[in-house]
C-alpha cells in the first residue's frame, strides 16, 4: 500500500490514511462487518477499526477503560493493565464535526495466541471516538506484540515496523463520508 494514501473503509463510508504496507486482513480471512482490520507485512502488528454500539452508561475516561477491558475479555487476556488514559483534542480530528468526546489509552494485555499455552504481553494503543448522534463508539486499536515476534532481518527492512505516529495519523485522518452507514437517524 502506498504511503499517505487515503484508503476507503466500510465500503467508502469512511476513509483514513493507513501506514505503508498495510494488508487488508479481509483479503486473507473473514472479518466481521463492523470491523476493518489491517496487518503489517512483516511484524505481528495490527490495526483494527471497529464500529461499536454506544456504551452510554460509561462516560469520559471510564468509557476508554471499559472498551480496553472488553477487548481483553473477548481476547481471553489473562491480565489487563492500563498504562495511561488521556483526552484527545477534538480540533485535531477530521471527525471533529461529529465526534463529541475522544480518548486515547495505552495498556498491556497478557494474551496467548490461538493454540498456544504461553501468554505474551501485548501493548495496545487505543483511540475511542464517541459519536452519540449515531449511537456509535468508534474504537481504533493498534496492537504491538513483543518486538521479537518475527524476524526483522535486513531482508525485511523495506517495510519498517509501524510507530505510534502511524497510529496517530490513522486516528486524526479518519473521515466520515456517508452517515447513511449508521442507518436512519
Curated annotation (Swiss-Prot):
> What InterPro entries does UniProt report for this protein, alphabetically?
Mog1, Mog1/PsbP_a/b/a-sand
List the membrane topology term(s).
Peripheral membrane protein
According to the UniProt record, one GO cellular component term is: rough endoplasmic reticulum
List where in the cell it is found. Nucleus; Cytoplasm, Perinuclear region; Cytoplasm; Cell membrane
Query: Which residue stretches, if any, does this entry annotate as coiled coil?
Result: none
MF terms in GO: guanyl-nucleotide exchange factor activity; small GTPase binding; sodium channel regulator activity; transmembrane transporter binding
What upregulates or represses it? Down-regulated in mice lacking Ovol1.
Provide the residue span(s) of the region labelled Interaction with RAN: 27-70
What processes does the entry annotate via GO biological process terms? endoplasmic reticulum to Golgi vesicle-mediated transport; mitotic spindle assembly; nucleocytoplasmic transport; positive regulation of protein localization to cell surface; positive regulation of protein localization to plasma membrane; protein exit from endoplasmic reticulum; regulation of bundle of His cell action potential; regulation of cardiac muscle cell action potential involved in regulation of contraction
Identify one Pfam family in the record. Mog1
Tissue expression remark = Highgly abundant in cardiac cells. Expressed in testis during prepubertal development.
- Any idea which UniProt keywords this protein has? Cell membrane, Cytoplasm, Guanine-nucleotide releasing factor, Membrane, Nucleus, Protein transport, Transport
Main localisation, per the record?
Answer: nucleus
Q: How does it assemble?
A: Monomer. Interacts with RAN, both RAN-GTP and RAN-GDP. Competes with RCC1 for a common binding site on RAN and thereby inhibits RCC1-mediated nucleotide exchange. Forms a complex with RAN-GTP and RANBP1. Interacts with the cytoplasmic loop 2 of SCN5A.
Q: Which function does this protein serve?
A: May regulate the intracellular trafficking of RAN. Promotes guanine nucleotide release from RAN and inhibits binding of new GTP by preventing the binding of the RAN guanine nucleotide exchange factor RCC1. Regulates the levels of GTP-bound RAN in the nucleus, and thereby plays a role in the regulation of RAN-dependent mitotic spindle dynamics. Enhances the expression of SCN5A at the cell membrane in cardiomyocytes.
**What is the similarity comment for this entry?**
Belongs to the MOG1 family.
Q: What is this protein called?
A: Ran guanine nucleotide release factor
- Organism of origin: Mus musculus
Amino acid at each position: 500500500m502506498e504511503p499517505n494514501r487515503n484508503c476507503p473503509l466500510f465500503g467508502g463510508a469512511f476513509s483514513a490514511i493507513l501506514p505503508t504496507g498495510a494488508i487488508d486482513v479481509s483479503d486473507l480471512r473473514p472479518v466481521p462487518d463492523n470491523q476493518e482490520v489491517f496487518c503489517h507485512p512483516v511484524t505481528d502488528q495490527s490495526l483494527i477499526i471497529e464500529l461499536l454500539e454506544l456504551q452510554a452508561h460509561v462516560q469520559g475516561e471510564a468509557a476508554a477503560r471499559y472498551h480496553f477491558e472488553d477487548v481483553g475479555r473477548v481476547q481471553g487476556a489473562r491480565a489487563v493493565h492500563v498504562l495511561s488514559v488521556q483526552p484527545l483534542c477534538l480540533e485535531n480530528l477530521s471527525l471533529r464535526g461529529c465526534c463529541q468526546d475522544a480518548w486515547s489509552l495505552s495498556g498491556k494485555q497478557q494474551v496467548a495466541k490461538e493454540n498456544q499455552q504461553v501468554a505474551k504481553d501485548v501493548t495496545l494503543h487505543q483511540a475511542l471516538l464517541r459519536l452519540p448522534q449515531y449511537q456509535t463508539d468508534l474504537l481504533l486499536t493498534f496492537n504491538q506484540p513483543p518486538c521479537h515476534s518475527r524476524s526483522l532481518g535486513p531482508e525485511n527492512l523495506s517495510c519498517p515496523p509501524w510507530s505510534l505516529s502511524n497510529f496517530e495519523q490513522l486516528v486524526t485522518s479518519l473521515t466520515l463520508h456517508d452517515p447513511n452507514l449508521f442507518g436512519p437517524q
